[in-house]
Amino acid sequence: MSNTPYNSSVPSIASMTQSSVSRSPNMHTATTPGANTSSNSPPLHMSSDSSKIKRKRNRIPLSCTICRKRKVKCDKLRPHCQQCTKTGVAHLCHYMEQTWAEEAEKELLKDNELKKLRERVKSLEKTLSKVHSSPSSNSLKSYNTPESSNLFMGSDEHTTLVNANTGSASSASHMHQQQQQQQQQEQQQDFSRSANANANSSSLSISNKYDNDELDLTKDFDLLHIKSNGTIHLGATHWLSIMKGDPYLKLLWGHIFAMREKLNEWYYQKNSYSKLKSSKCPINHAQAPPSAAAAATRKCPVDHSAFSSGMVAPKEETPLPRKCPVDHTMFSSGMIPPREDTSSQKRCPVDHTMYSAGMMPPKDETPSPFSTKAMIDHNKHTMNPPQSKCPVDHRNYMKDYPSDMANSSSNPASRCPIDHSSMKNTAALPASTHNTIPHHQPQSGSHARSHPAQNRKHDSYMTESEVLATLCEMLPPKRVIALFIEKFFKHLYPAIPILDEQNFKNHVNQMLSLSSMNPTVNNFGMSMPSSSTLENQPITQINLPKLSDSCNLGILIIILRLTWLSIPSNSCEVDLGEESGSFLVPNESSNMSASALTSMAKEESLLLKHETPVEALELCQKYLIKFDELSSISNNNVNLTTVQFAIFYNFYMKSASNDLTTLTNTNNTGMANPGHDSESHQILLSNITQMAFSCGLHRDPDNFPQLNATIPATSQDVSNNGSKKANPSTNPTLNNNMSAATTNSSSRSGSADSRSGSNPVNKKENQVSIERFKHTWRKIWYYIVSMDVNQSLSLGSPRLLRNLRDFSDTKLPSASRIDYVRDIKELIIVKNFTLFFQIDLCIIAVLNHILNVSLARSVRKFELDSLINLLKNLTYGTENVNDVVSSLINKGLLPTSEGGSVDSNNDEIYGLPKLPDILNHGQHNQNLYADGRNTSSSDIDKKLDLPHESTTRALFFSKHMTIRMLLYLLNYILFTHYEPMGSEDPGTNILAKEYAQEALNFAMDGYRNCMIFFNNIRNTNSLFDYMNVILSYPCLDIGHRSLQFIVCLILRAKCGPLTGMRESSIITNGTSSGFNSSVEDEDVKVKQESSDEMKKDDFMKDVNLDSGDSLAEILMSRMLLFQKLTKQLSKKYNYAIRMNKSTGFFVSLLDTPSKKSDSKSGGSSFMLGNWKHPKVSNMSGFLAGDKDQLQKCPVYQDALGFVSPTGANEGSAPMQGMSLQGSTARMGGTQLPPIRSYKPITYTSSNLRRMNETGEAEAKRRRFNDGYIDNNSNNDIPRGISPKPSNGLSSVQPLLSSFSMNQLNGGTIPTVPSLTNITSQMGALPSLDRITTNQINLPDPSRDEAFDNSIKQMTPMTSAFMNANTTIPSSTLNGNMNMNGAGTANTDTSVNGSALSTLTSPQGSDLASNSATQYKPDLEDFLMQNSNFNGLMINPSSLVEVVGGYNDPNNLGRNDAVDFLPVDNVEIDGLVDFYRADFPIWE
């Protein structure tokens, strides 16, 4: 290999400099041609030659790294040589920078910077002139006038002339006038053509018309999740933001939430009637509100003496457990009971008299006398020392008690009735111990966790030696650890490349003595075991001489755990049936030999046998690293190794979310997955960022010369036969803060010997070690920057590291002077850092316009269009990433302070490959997409085996998914902005449809990529080998986001036009509760035909919005396939459970109802207790929270938060809108903008035809008590049948169209609301109990003497609802009213400060002729009245399961249902203490 210093490709300045250096100082000796200067040199120069040898010039190779690695001749061409081009690795062609060429490089950088600044000035002036050219952004005439065009073009030409600095003022003015005249003619022609063109040909001009439209994203897509312990803000990029941004979803959720409340009221009436018939007290004692009389006496307001003698006592209905929470089987033969007064007997430590008759006294800490929490006398309980386990059976205790008690963290007694502080925990828990909630964990701090303690000691007081001994038992054998580490650096390291591989392996050798297994040592100092006899050699000792070694041990445990989880055999097996073949990608198994495949299979089978338990990480981070203290209150021991462990810990929690419940005590926030949406990750990332600032990572290490003065002992010396293993403390590591304080005397003496020049080889190695330390420094910093961008994108939260270049000058890892010839994979890592940072800059440009309040409040359409076009150029490969970043800067979309200036000398060859090329790597004749291109074949003379190539391509795949998800989000934002404007401005219809089609294309692209990933994770040697854990959640999250848009389009396709709020009725055409037989038969036939077509559907093709009637069926087939996928993934990943529930929720809700199939099983098929949906099980657990819990859900708040305040004009037309009395008054009069009526982009003539046919169908007669009742009859209406409104509207009224009180036959039908709803009106959120609709009829109280007598004994507040004698006129339907004890109406009064719905007495209706014994609520009739949503007939049976059942008091405190919406199961602390109180005991 020739390395001549004289190369024509080197710049002339550099060549001259090098030649002058090589010819001096002996230039005079070369005067005689052909003379041998070395042999004729006088002896005087011998000393000079010897001095040259001592200096040992650090010669930089001129050949590229790849050619030197392959040991072939390099032609040294820039930017890449011919050898690399032929081999197909031109993107990896890398030249080491020459030290003597730095000055010339700086001059070139200055020229490039000036050139870019000129281009940016031109672009900014052009953009500014465009903005000022159109003062009216919504007027096509003002924009297309010749004057505005002249201003635009004239300003543009003027800037060009000024920048060129050529020509005189007169010539410039002449040219300017000519250009104005030319532009006037062109603009007039364009204006005349646009006036006569059709909609398709004028799309460009229409787009220009709305370019300056402003969008306010701060209100349309921001959510606030009110939790039990605080609030969480969710920005526009969060997956829940679509729930607020889409009007159809908002109305649908409002319908579902209101329907759920009405269903609860129906169950309440049914239960009240059952109690009335069985002579039980009608008051729910567990949920009864306080009153003035009852609060003082703590007695039930109902006179029980008025009931018959056979009445069952109300205490039997109490939901509180009467079972002793103590596991009596815990009392061993030698145990001394804890109670002081029963020391000679084996008695239960709990006083059972406290549980007699269901009486649960309040705990000491609660000042309220009406608390439901139990009290145990902790002062009388002392634990015997031999007892090692709490005698309380935590399973029964935590399951039976209310959730607010179980989740209380202020007092340990609220979690367990035993005082654990008096226990002495010295013995170990048995292996068969059930999963208990440990009580030794601290309850403060972001990382105080509660998790099961399995197969390990009760670690309340474990010493360091005990922890190390336990870890030795948990860790795998030495040979297995070595294999795990090799697998990690081969497959997983590119995903988190913040370690120095060589240095980390050496530290593992020092801690675990792995080098003692085999004398053979590889190049990185890691022993490579080869003998099977040493396979089971266990870890007997762990050496941790320094604090940083504890962090390295923690990183090792994470690597062992994460690598084991990522083994392809551990991935979830997915079988999509016939569609599986559509999502397969070619693997590389065919390129491997049979012996290599066999060896790989043996290694994986060996690794599968040795799982590192997650408890090992808990012990290490709690007792050795003490990470809770480091991340919260102390930074004394923070160094680079600590930051690395924190990053690995964060990475592990996000990837291995199934272990999150073991490592964290994060409460169930109801999010899609607590491991990914939890705020604990935000806190941890902020701690990592602050620790990085503390270590100085935001400054480049070249700024600190003291790093060069502190020269560490080289890792190569340590690796040579382990000579320094006996005294590891004398070997400072690269991962420590390299300061004089951390370097002991022995290392400093060794460094002094090296600096003295006695060992030049060691000095050179030390310089390499310092450079590698700086390299690790830079990698850690830019990985933190990437983490910040990803978290902001996932949660919609502001970035922590904004305007990076204002406070950081850290260079990219590509600036490190490292020779990668021995470590090619590190070269790939370096290039990935540069590429991924440039992609992050593109993402930052989008996040700035969506999340930054200053920009998002008035972002313009043309800015979002520019972002869309640049991102499309990037993901489609039509523009290099460098050009995309430059365009963002030039257009003012990305400030240079974000880091754009760093990319001045980036490699233009190494870019983001096209997605088809990534998926079809090595397969030139196979395409997954219809528009995919075959990669051109190149002449490859010698294949270079690149390390972790498949992992790098998998990371490229994830970057494509992220970019295309942003494209979907931007198009969706513009679509939802312009779609409602179509009724007022028809020109926006074209824009809305274009954006909708683009959003659908990118949503389907994310859906396909999600399917491709999960369909190939188990394939051997596939693209996603060992990436199943790391990329599972990102891929599934993007697929879930895509399905949300599918739901939006299905609603539009099935519902038709949205007639809006406060303008007209939701249903424009009257519909009936029944179905026309001909229409139903046609629908069934069409559904069967569409299902047959779905079998032939190609899931890899895009979906066209013009598909017509089949659009809903096509999209529904995608949802069914995704539901099938998430159901299979739920066995492996916890976050897939919620996504499966979410998908099943909409599948069941939007499925086309079939009246015939429902009628076969009779009317009882709608009963919640006797029916389950065949497709989705346990659907009623979706919204398991009660009404107050739902009020804290951000989806609920935004679904019902846009209502208008009640006005006088709305009182005369209660059916035309919805209103919540008093809600806006409490909220200070603020409200979200109303939803306007408009036709969706999917609306066709077929929708109108079906709505008319359905509307003309006559209402079917329904069977009631073996007889038919005519709904149109004006006679007495039997029980259970809601009367038809007198205003001519159909009896089937959608719930949203009748939130205000409906007039029914001249009066209103009252409903006894749940008594718990009375006291929940003081919150700032609107409550559902004021939302009224067609109610189920009540029995006549006058026919039941017991009922009438009980009403007389009620408090005035309760009597207002149960014994009102005055019929309220229609003019006061929307007013605030209350009833006194006499039954008279008092206007302008309220209960607890909030208005209630107007109610009338049942005696005033036609129901008085029937007795209470004839009353039988009909659930089917009730559901059919509310199953119509904007023309979409929702399956009533599905509605029951979707909205959930009545919250039975006997089931209070259960927390087994998992909501896919963020619904908390406990109250928010401090918010309800002043107005919430219950009656747990009735005397």
Swiss-Prot record:
Taxonomic path: Eukaryota, Fungi, Dikarya, Ascomycota, Saccharomycotina
Keywords for the protein's UniProt record, in alphabetical order: Activator, Coiled coil, DNA-binding, Heme, Iron, Metal-binding, Nucleus, Repeat, Transcription, Transcription regulation, Zinc
An MF annotation (GO) of this entry: zinc ion binding
Comp. bias intervals (Low complexity): 130-142, 177-208, 735-759
Gene Ontology terms: biological process: DNA-templated transcription
DNA-binding region: 64-93
PANTHER family documented for this protein: HEME-RESPONSIVE ZINC FINGER TRANSCRIPTION FACTOR HAP1
Additional observations: Heme is an effector molecule for CYP1/HAP1. The repeat region (see FT table) mediates heme induction by masking the DNA-binding domain in the absence of inducer.
Biased composition (Polar residues): 1-50, 143-152, 160-176, 432-447, 706-734
Organism: Saccharomyces cerevisiae (strain Lalvin EC1118 / Prise de mousse) (Baker's yeast)
Gene name per UniProt: HAP1
Subcellular locations according to the entry: Nucleus
Protein name: Heme-responsive zinc finger transcription factor HAP1
